Every structure is written in C-alpha cells, then in structure tokens.
C-alpha cells in the first residue's frame, strides 16, 4: 500500500520533525493526519480505529448470522450495505469475507485483534474512560483465538457468533 501511496498515515512528533517528514509521508499515504507532538497520541488514534473495526466485525457477524438463520442471501446484503449505508473497506471487505467464510490469507489475525481490543481497554483505563462493549468484544476475540483460529483473519470472529447460533463452519 505504501508503494501505491494508499496508506492512511497518523503522524506525531515535534512540529519541525513532522514538517520535515511530510514530503516522504505524502508519497506513501493518500492522507496524513497530524496527532500532536507525542507518539502516544497517534498510537491512541490507531488503537481507537482498530477498536472501531472490532465493533464493525461483531456487528457484521450478528447481522450476517441473523440473515443466515432467516435463509437470506448474505452476499447480496453485504453488497447492499457497501453500496449504501457503509461504503468502504471495513463493511465491504470484511463483510464479504464473513459472508463467504474466507479468512485466509489473513490481513490481520484474530490474535492481533484481541491484542488491539486489550490495548483499547488499557488506554481507556489509563484515561478514566468506560468502554461498555469491551468485555463482550474481549470474550468474542478470546474465543475466536482459542476455538476458531489464532492465525485466521480477524473477520473470523464471526464464527463465534455463528457457532452460538448453531451455524457452525466446521
């Protein structure tokens, strides 16, 4: 993605250093987002993005499981949401993976997803913030790592919800 200039870059650091890095960053990324003077700020933003994706994966898992239990075409559903309310790589790409149960090769593994959920929990604790859905996400990701596959794409967390709805993929 860097060679294609398609990365989303979160930059942080001393303004002079960030300014000096901008020409290189702009070549690698389609957009550079500045997050202040500390690397911790950019890290927190990245953790928050991945925490949001974890929520999206679980929402997709639940919606697709509901459709499967109702006998509907999940591929058409994913195409519809990607064309209307949720265009983009998260709902479109991961939605398709979940609908097709295509979790290899992984772009980001379930074990890395669990790590990022826990990083969000730790960051929230440090900031005094509450993440009410975090215990559910943690449990789903822990189950995915131990019972579905630690090295599968993190979209495979959908199989936890499917399994609990008696739609096993094994």
Model region roles, listed by residue range:
Residues 29-32, 131, 169:
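Secondary-structure boundary/capping signal
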Residues 19, 165-170:
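Hydrophobic alpha-helical segments
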Residues 41-164:
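Helical "substrate-binding/catalytic lid" subdomain
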Residues 1-51:
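Rossmann-fold dinucleotide-binding core
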């Amino acid at each position: 993605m860097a060679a294609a200039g398609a990365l989303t870059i979160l930059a942080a650091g001393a303004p002079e250093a960030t300014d000096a890095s901008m020409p290189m960053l702009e070549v690698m990324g389609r957009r550079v987002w500045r997050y202040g003077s500390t690397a911790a700020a950019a890290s927190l933003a990245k953790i928050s993005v991945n925490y949001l994706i974890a929520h999206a994966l679980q929402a997709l898992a639940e919606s697709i499981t509901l459709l499967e239990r109702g006998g509907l075409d999940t591929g058409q559903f994913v195409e519809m949401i990607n064309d209307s309310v949720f265009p983009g790589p998260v709902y479109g790409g991961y939605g398709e993976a979940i609908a097709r149960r295509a979790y290899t090769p992984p772009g980001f593994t379930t074990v890395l997803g669990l790590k990022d959920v826990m990083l969000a929990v730790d960051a929230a604790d440090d900031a005094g913030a509450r993440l009410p859905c975090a215990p559910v996400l943690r449990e789903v990701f822990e189950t995915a790592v131990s019972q579905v596959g630690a090295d599968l794409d993190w979209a495979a967390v959908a199989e936890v919800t499917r399994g609990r709805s008696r739609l096993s993929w094994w």
